[in-house]
């Protein structure tokens, strides 16, 4: 994971402005071969948005624009950029994601080492380079959304219909982290609510 920013990039009017973020990845680089990988989600661009909860308000295709600038000890620099030589897969464990409607995650589809050098991507598809107006690509100016604290449930109980309820004792913005075990194909459903 690069950085501590969450839900990036933030909302913007994508037809007029696309914000980029910068990160120092020096501590993540290793001697020998390295790999760059990214997970893309629907976010504000393609997810449900607005009072009508319309999808694809700005477009229906996800895209990644990436540039890695390497400065060697001897002063040389090298650029690694996302281009049509990259590959992508939509067969990973995240089956659906939406800022309002949550995420469907199928652990049976996890790809061990997908973000490591030497991963066999033979069954991945080639990506297509998209043209865009470079004038609308700007640095992010707003502060990042970051985690501020971890809150534990104040009460865990069963509802009359057998659902497990975690009461955090306050309104909050966030998500639940949990460990589960069970047979392959078992389903766990988390629903967040303000009660």
Label for each model-derived stretch:
Residues 1-195:
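Extracellular/oxidizing-compartment recognition motifs
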């Amino acid at each position: 994971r690069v950085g501590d920013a969450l839900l990036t990039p933030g909302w913007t009017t994508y037809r007029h402005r696309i914000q980029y973020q910068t990160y120092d990845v020096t501590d993540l680089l290793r001697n020998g071969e390295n790999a760059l990988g990214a997970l893309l989600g629907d976010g504000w661009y393609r997810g449900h948005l607005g009072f009508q909860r319309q999808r694809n308000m700005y477009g229906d295709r996800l895209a990644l624009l990436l540039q890695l600038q390497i400065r060697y000890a001897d002063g040389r620099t090298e650029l690694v950029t996302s281009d049509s030589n990259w590959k992508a897969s939509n067969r990973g464990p995240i089956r659906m994601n939406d800022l309002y409607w949550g995420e469907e995650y199928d652990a049976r589809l996890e790809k061990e080492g997908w973000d490591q050098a030497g991963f066999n991507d033979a069954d991945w598809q080639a990506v297509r380079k998209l043209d865009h107006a470079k004038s609308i690509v700007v640095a992010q100016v707003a502060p990042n959304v970051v985690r501020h604290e971890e809150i534990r449930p104040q009460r865990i109980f069963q509802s009359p219909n057998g659902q497990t309820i975690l009461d955090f004792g306050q309104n909050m913005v966030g998500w639940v982290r949990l460990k589960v075990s069970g047979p392959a194909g078992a389903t766990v459903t988390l629903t967040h609510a303000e009660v």
